[in-house]
Amino acid sequence: MKYDHLLVRYGELTLKGSNRKKFVNQLRNNVNKSLKGLDGFVVKGKRDRMYIELEDHADINEITYRLSKIFGIKSISPVLKVEKTIEAMSAAAIKFAQQFEENSTFKIDVKRADKNFPMDTYELQRELGGTVLKQIENVSVNVKRPDHEIRVEVRLDAIYMYEEVVPGSGGLPVGTGGKTLLMLSGGIDSPVAGMEVMRRGVTIEAIHFHSPPFTSDQAKEKVIELTRILAERVGPIKLHIVPFTELQKRVNKVVHPRYTMTSTRRMMMRVADKLVHQIGALAIVNGENLGQVASQTLHSMYAINNVTSTPVLRPLLTYDKEEIIIKSKEIGTFETSIQPFEDCCTIFTPKNPVTEPNFEKVVQYESVFDFEEMINRAVENIETLEITSDYKTIKEQQTNQLINDFL
């Protein structure tokens, strides 16, 4: 079947009332950005849905795949656009039915947005169904559990006919909900947290704390790859890599061993808070899950949050671990997240970390050293990378260059 359009249905944009135009425009921009590098199509965003006009050479499968990853899209259908005549609809219905397997069943489903169309819904269903039965052998009607469903939408401008409905990612278009800073550790949770806030229309930049030589280049490349996977859905993402070694060593030198985990995370939050103001973000996002580990109890969160007035969003706060793993697999980050490279959260881990840290005590331990200068230095020496969906690490670039030189 050669389709001439893709019908793109909006997600929650239908709920946005007077702001709908802003949301539709942002979604259209996101679609154009996602389809960059492809040709043979024209994007037409309308108030209630989007149409993508296809030329003969358009790669419909690749376009559909990319659209399915964009937040704000509920579903996509390859469609035939036909004239508003029963003859044109009948001819299209026969085209669809010619693709059916022998002895298969079908139904005709009509939605009549144009109430002025001369035939009502049931008349159209009977007429088109009857035409298929007359013209196509060895098929029958089953309205409850059909093998195939020919869908017909009667709209003001034309008739749109289709069979397939490809699920989209739902949510809201990224860029409509402000900017946040995602604390990206390299584990299973934080990429899922990032994806969850992006689903709500939020733009993200990511921050990662790197402590060489205790953390390896492979750990850094792992985080780059996680960012790249996130970028597949939203376009380029800035990744800020913080040199954290000296700060982490100092914490472990001056703070009581049971409190080093709490204090380390307070230092991370202080660095993140400064970066938030530099990049114009409105919140910090992390993958914390209530009670999962010692640093994620309510007492720990209270002690850690105290160093910032910036809102800290925790999309996974009440999820079961299994739910997070399922989502990680769905978005494609799980296999990368479980690669066995240590991040700064797993080094210097005390044997018996405090689970209910006393806020006054952690402040007292940290007061023996002025950390502000070290924090400022860490922020000043941040390495910022812009990660695209086709980003390659230095190691990959070097490997490709060696291959090219050899050839």
Swiss-Prot record:
It is an enzyme of class 2 (transferase). The keyword Coiled coil does not apply. GO terms for biological process: thiamine biosynthetic process; thiamine diphosphate biosynthetic process; thiazole biosynthetic process; tRNA 4-thiouridine biosynthesis. ATP binds at M183, L184, H208, F209, R265, G287, Q296. Keywords: ATP-binding, Cytoplasm, Nucleotide-binding, RNA-binding, Thiamine biosynthesis, Transferase, tRNA-binding. Belongs to the ThiI family. This is Probable tRNA sulfurtransferase. It comes from Staphylococcus aureus (strain JH9).
